[in-house]
């Protein structure tokens, strides 16, 4: 059985500072990476920055700085975002690194040697903002790219990749691998695009300089998307099969925004087929965010700075909201009031309140120790409906994550916490101390065990807070994987818990 897993974010374009979309993609990828690690897999999680191209060159010129200095600064802002958002990436690739440039040159030469690249002359529409070529038929009635980006007519010598040759092979691959593109709506869009006819793709430019030079013809720079996509293999050490490339490729999951799906689901597999490299297993395209129902744009002044959000609300609170608020793959709306509601109603009232009530009662009434139980009682507890629900959700969540139904995993966890809050109210352990102390011990143990399940399942989403919960419950650091969510690793009777501390404070600031 394969015990490795390779997941990537897109490498982010450095023409501007990070925004909420970058944060969302990074957190979603991080949640999946952490989840897979907790399943016992050896995970490689890659993120990084895409630093070449005409758009970056223009941005640097506009600021009157050298492109390398410009990209150094902007790339660092993305690295800072990863640190602040507690992203657990194993590597951070920059396309200006020598390891990447060397791999791209080898990749280009392989395509050339295989007869899939040829010289010609390009004449057509190009959107600098998208770093993409568009056919006349794809332009809007206003003469813009489908994304709304302005286009310009480009005429220049160019190398071409024979994309048209791969049309049928791509369609055959999509048919044979229905999970290659998710969600299904995006898969259908890609298939429709490919069926409409693929034209050979210009893969070099001569009208600007900021990029990787074409080997043996330095008048040309390699098309930024061929350059960028190759980062997924260059970061692993391509073409050395004794490196991580041999260990982790093909990728298990590329997480991308829907706006760059064509590059990943059409161009990338075609390049790989042409270079005789195995294709990634799945490309997951998520939606866009709006701000209070409005499209986010600089001109409207409604961009969302994820760093400021974290400063105000806390990193785990923002991570939780991003993953809970929207079905992964669909568009989402950022509303401050919804963020506050998620924090106060779910994290604080449901999970935090359950943790606080239970641990405070145990600490005060049971000397801060997991209750001692009569022989066989733990087996009996595991037959209770609430523990059966916990076990069921633990199994369900693995299946849900395999389908990248991230918010449904959180929904299960919240439902379990709601059931536990109902349980504590109905059993009222505070009334049992004098009348039935053995029953009180059973109730408290049950609640602590449910909290163990909740905390272990929350680790991918809110790692810092979840681990504080596990510390508070006295769970060994070596027993926090998903395989430990069984009766054999139940809390040890008589073990100590930490003095209760508030992990999920309510947000008392402005709601709007």
From Swiss-Prot:
InterPro entries: Anticodon_Met, Met-tRNA_synth, Met-tRNA_synth_2, Methionyl/Leucyl_tRNA_Synth, MetRS_core, Rossmann-like_a/b/a_fold, tRNAsynth_Ia_anticodon-bd. Keywords: Aminoacyl-tRNA synthetase, ATP-binding, Cytoplasm, Ligase, Nucleotide-binding, Protein biosynthesis. A motif ('HIGH' region) lies at residues 12-22. CDD domains: Anticodon_Ia_Met (cd07957), MetRS_core (cd00814). The keyword Transmembrane does not apply. One of its GO terms (biological process) is methionyl-tRNA aminoacylation. ATP binds at residue 298. A motif ('KMSKS' region) lies at residues 295-299. It is an enzyme of class 6 (ligase). One of its GO terms (cellular component) is cytoplasm. Its EC number is 6.1.1.10. GO terms for molecular function: ATP binding; methionine-tRNA ligase activity. It is found in: Cytoplasm. It catalyses: tRNA(Met) + L-methionine + ATP = L-methionyl-tRNA(Met) + AMP + diphosphate. The keyword ATP-binding applies. Belongs to the class-I aminoacyl-tRNA synthetase family. MetG type 2B subfamily. Is required not only for elongation of protein synthesis but also for the initiation of all mRNA translation through initiator tRNA(fMet) aminoacylation. Monomer. This is Methionine--tRNA ligase. The lineage of its organism: Bacteria, Pseudomonadati, Pseudomonadota, Alphaproteobacteria, Rickettsiales.
